[in-house]
Curated annotation (Swiss-Prot):
Gene3D superfamilies per the UniProt record, alphabetical: 3.30.230.10, 3.30.70.240, Elongation Factor G (Translational Gtpase), domain 3, P-loop containing nucleotide triphosphate hydrolases, Translation factors
Positions that bind GTP: 17-24, 81-85, 135-138
Name of this chain's protein: Elongation factor G
Domain tr-type G positions: 8-283
Gene name in the database record: fusA
Record lineage: Bacteria, Pseudomonadati, Pseudomonadota, Alphaproteobacteria, Rickettsiales
Length: 699
């Protein structure tokens, strides 16, 4: 491995898209043509290599991002296959954080769907260079040009078309390569492994010339010398075009667009060529942001093999044979099995046991890995998703990932005493794997409550609990995960004092509580958080060692709000003053004082109840439009826009999650089964007062 595993030879890429756009099939074909799979796995037969959990094979959707290493030309491609269902958006977010480039797969019939937009925005957030693969060109109703138009309109993406389809629907047989100006035709009888180049068909020559001119107009903008050459009428070489496309893709000036049919094995090899030619290597990315532990300074760290070791844990998975596996992306230095590193987030040392290179769910033991590699480590004790592993002598904390608040929750009760213990273990394992899944205990009923990003998310968690951990449980009805917040700022001066013989307890804190939306000088790293704590103590009014007690107290108690006991979010607490006693003060005393201040502050801050609002997209034939809009309005929905799409209408609305239970049946009866919908969490918003009263009464 080591000789070719130089940084410039590596491509760390994700394949992401909406559910059913053909992402897993595309990945399967890539593995087949790069020689890693000996037979092609079909998703609809439940045999796809990347979909390795039982639940995935049954449902035909990808739930966890399996990481796979393969080779093309002389390059190493690490592929992360990401889920396309909206309940698993967190998986996509985790993968994008550690990737250098991505391939966005679009359904040539449906075009840009809601999850495609979400994934695109997430990729924008992490500045991931990407290209687009318009798939399913063999399907009835496929329209490459309409799909490209949607990519431009809906995603605001500057498209660079580098291929055109030859033939449509069942007559789709190949592509025009606009860089070489050649047609590429696949032989059906060889399962797409054999293809040949020929001249562009006569009826497509004018169109190809037009799109080639557009391609050149866009790429020559990136280089003045080549632009002059182009304007003077000189020929631009294929090599020059490729260099410019690579430059523009890495700088996100445009997004190359390719097409094909992964299922029919057409277009996969040129897609692999484009991944290698146009997507960045770790060297092109160059740096990773982080904090130097010794100075607490934020710095840019070079991605390099010669620097000290640093890596980000981006996924934890339970493997039936190896136990817990931690997937890491190495940003700098190298690591050998048996070495000891430090988890700088938890300040705990970890010994590296087995190190594995993963191929979906086959594994290869390796002894060494270095910058740019994505590997799985077995046997780490304290590392969870988003933690940094670092060289002990030169410690860094890499930029952490932010995870969304869960929107739906349900109670689970073990069926027997034996299940009780197993359930605790199962849920803590599953929560370690997936930060968007949370477990808590209802203080009033003592029930265990699980929370997640949607009904399917929790269904799969419960299913895994039964299958992998053999836990039988009774499941309650899904409930909305309400939240609470404050709407006005207040300052609380609170003293905790206890004297009952022997050492007493004393702590005084002065805390300003304010809604996050009103904070003017909010730091960038705090912008996605739901709770921010800051200490502005000067002159030792509260000694440094007691301040973590204040933060811990606030963090613990904010899980129980003051209106109906829901967690408090979207506020900042600033410790501005306080007092301590040489003998009677302790971390615990300051923790209790912070809790007392919180209770007072939340009452004074004009608290309000919040509910999750979902972005709902309904695709319906024209004739049912009126009924569907009327129904959404009756669910407290707000229509955002209406777009024609082919012979159907697309209605986008913001609707409270509380009003969406059972919507699938209503929609079916309103449209005689012809409309479909998808929904994704959008934001939290205040609950109208009459609805809030009903929620409080239920509590």
């Amino acid at each position: 491995m080591s000789k070719i595993n130089k940084l410039e030879q590596i491509r760390n890429i994700g394949i992401c898209a909406h559910i059913d756009a053909g992402k897993t099939t595309t990945t399967e074909r890539i593995l087949y043509y790069t020689g890693k799979s000996h037979k092609i796995g079909e998703v609809h037969e439940g045999g796809a290599t990347m979909d390795w959990m039982e639940q995935e094979q049954e449902r035909g959707i990808t739930i966890t991002s399996a990481a796979t290493t393969c080779r093309w030309q002389d390059k190493v491609i690490n592929i992360i296959d990401t889920p396309g269902h909206v309940d698993f958006t967190i998986e996509v977010e985790r993968s994008l954080r550690v990737l250098d480039g991505a391939v966005a797969v679009f359904d040539g019939v449906a075009g840009v769907e809601p999850q495609s937009e979400t994934v695109w925005r997430q990729a924008d957030k992490y500045n991931v260079p990407r290209m687009c693969f318009v798939n399913k060109m063999d399907r009835m109703g496929a329209d490459f040009y309409r799909c490209v138009e949607m990519i431009k309109d809906r995603l605001g993406a500057r498209s660079l078309i580098i291929q055109l389809p030859i033939g449509i629907e069942e007559n789709f047989k190949g592509i025009v390569n606009l860089i070489k100006m050649k047609a590429v035709i696949w032989k059906d009888e060889s399962l797409g492994a054999e293809y040949f180049e020929e001249d562009i068909p006569a009826d497509m020559q004018d169109k190809a010339a037009e799109y080639r001119a557009r391609l050149l107009d866009m790429v020559v903008e990136l280089d003045d010398t080549i632009m002059e050459q182009y304007l003077s009428g000189a020929e631009i070489t294929e090599e020059q075009i490729k260099i410019l496309i690579r430059k523009g893709t890495i700088e996100a000036r445009f997004y190359p667009i390719l097409c094909g049919s992964a299922f029919k094995n057409k277009g996969v090899q040129p897609l692999l060529d484009a991944i290698v030619d146009f997507l960045p290597s770790p060297i092109d990315i160059g740096i990773v942001k982080g904090i130097e532990v010794s100075t607490s300074e934020e710095k840019d760290f070079p991605i390099s093999i010669v620097e000290p070791f640093s890596a980000l844990a981006f996924k934890i998975m339970n493997d039936p044979f190896v136990g817990s596996l931690t997937f890491i992306r190495i940003y700098s230095g190298k690591i050998t099995s048996g070495a000891t590193v430090i988890n700088t987030v938890k300040n705990k040392r970890e010994k590296i046991g087995r190190m594995l290179l993963m191929h979906a769910n086959n594994r290869e033991d390796i002894k060494e890995a270095s910058a740019g590699d994505i590997v799985a480590l077995a046997g780490l004790k304290d590392t969870s998703t988003g933690d940094t592993l670092s060289d002990i002598d030169k410690q860094v904390v890499l930029e952490r990932m932010e995870f969304p608040e869960p929107v739906i929750e349900l109670a689970v009760e073990p069926k027997s005493t034996a299940d009780q213990e197993k359930m605790g273990l199962a849920l803590s394992r599953l929560a370690a794997e997936d930060p968007s899944f949370r477990v808590s205990t209802d203080h009033e009923t003592g029930q265990t409550v699980i929370k997640g990003m949607g009904e399917l998310h929790l269904e799969i968690i419960i299913d895994r609990m039964r299958r992998e951990f053999k836990v039988e449980a009774n499941i309650g009805a899904p409930q909305v995960a309400y939240r609470e917040t404050i709407t006005t700022a207040c300052e609380i001066d609170y003293t905790h004092k206890k004297q009952s013989g022997g050492a007493g307890q004393f702590a005084r804190v002065k805390i300003i509580f304010e809604p996050l939306k009103d904070v003017i000088d909010l730091k960038d790293e705090d912008k996605n958080k739901t709770f921010v704590f800051e200490s502005k103590i000067v002159g030792g009014a509260v000694p440094k060692e007691y301040i973590p007690g204040v933060e811990k107290g606030l963090n613990n108690i904010r899980e129980t709000g003051v209106i109906a006991g829901y967690p408090m979010i979207d506020f900042k607490a600033t410790l501005v003053d306080g007092a301590f006693h040489d003998v009677d003060s302790s971390v615990l005393a300051f923790e209790i004082a912070a809790k007392g201040a919180f209770r007072e502050g939340m009452q004074k801050g004009n608290p309000k109840l919040l509910e999750p609002i979902m972005k709902v997209e309904v695709i319906t034939p024209d004739e049912y439009m009126g009924d569907i809009i009327g129904d959404l309005n009756s669910r407290r929905g707000q229509i955002q826009n209406m777009d024609p799409r082919g012979n159907a209408q697309v209605v986008t609305a913001h609707v409270p999650l509380a009003e969406m239970f059972g919507y699938v049946n209503t929609l079916r009866s309103l449209s005689q089964g012809r409309a479909q919908f998808s929904m994704i969490f959008s934001h939290y918003d205040q609950v109208p007062s009459q609805v809030a009263d009903m929620i409080k009464a239920k509590k």
